[in-house]
A protein has these predicted regions:
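Collagenous Gly-X-Y triple-helix signature in extracellular proteins
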Residues: 43-272
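Intrinsically disordered, compositionally biased repeat/linker segments
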Residues: 1-43
Length: 272
């Protein structure tokens, strides 16, 4: 549903409407007018992403507008465990498929920060997310093990976490207990996100087209990062020289509006 305004003698579609509330511009979600004593909707800006169920998928186009990539809602709000601060209070969206594949390094590694997996995620939004959405990505403080703490597995969290707009999920965030790592060698890098279940077994919630990386490294062993197999089961032996998939996660404000389109009886949700 669209409304138009006249500009230079031409009708131009209005994508968003704002009203002033307490001196602040607030975006209008829906607009109504009275017709024969009945309220008729003349504008629908969409529904806030917070109103959608976990597991719902959303399409976001790339900067060219020629491709649409799909993301699944896996958490709303700040995850539990006390390891996140208010920067995580948003809608967590996880790429539904593998976006790319890479190995990590030919040499011993000391963590996630600054290595191939992290660097790829840092550069991901610029080439894969349209600017109107990329500009709204939240910078989240992620629980992580600093390179200098590699041998002790001390987790930096809250305001001391790793600041990122795009990142890989940790194994813990996807439902793995730390003691399920090799000999317990997994740091507590976060808490389980609400969409996932506690299991190391195959699950559709983690299924993908191929094996893919997490941001969790085996404690005190720079040869391995934890990963998941294509069927969603836990892989504790992702060797740094092997090439595996990448499934980025982004976080948007909970009031982000979603446009829903019905096509042949099916609903598709888009973030513009």
């Amino acid at each position: 549903m669209a409304i138009y305004t006249g500009i230079g003698g031409s009708a131009k579609s209005v994508s968003k409407i704002y009203i002033g509330v307490g001196g602040t511009a607030r975006q209008v979600h829906k607009g109504y007018i009275g017709v024969d004593g009945v309220a008729k909707k003349f504008y629908d800006g969409g529904n806030p992403i917070s109103s959608f169920a976990l597991g719902t998928e959303f399409g976001i186009s790339d900067p060219s507008g020629n491709k649409t990539y799909w993301y699944k809602l896996i958490h709303k709000g700040v995850p539990g465990g006390g390891l996140y601060d208010s920067t995580a209070n948003g809608a967590w969206l996880w790429r539904t498929d593998i976006a790319a594949s890479t190995s990590i390094s030919n040499n011993y590694i000391y963590g996630y920060e600054g290595w191939a997996l992290d660097n790829w995620c840092v550069n991901y939004p610029g080439g894969n997310i349209k600017s109107s959405v990329a500009n709204r990505l939240m910078t989240v403080h992620l629980p992580y093990v600093k390179q200098s703490d590699d041998s002790s597995a001390n987790v930096s969290s809250g305001s001391n976490g790793l600041s990122r707009k795009c990142f890989l999920l940790s194994a813990v965030e996807m439902g793995i207990y730390t003691w399920q790592g090799i000999d317990g060698l997994m740091a507590q890098e976060g808490a389980k996100l609400d969409y996932f279940d506690y299991t190391t077994a195959a699950t559709d919630k983690r299924k993908a087209g191929d094996e893919y990386w997490t941001r969790s490294k085996r404690t005190n062993n720079g040869n391995y990062m934890y990963a998941f197999y294509a069927d969603g089961s836990f892989c504790n032996a992702g060797y740094r020289e092997d090439s595996h998939g990448l499934r980025p996660c982004i976080v948007l404000p909970l009031n982000t509006l979603v446009r829903t389109v019905t096509f042949w009886g099916a609903e598709f949700n888009y973030i513009d």
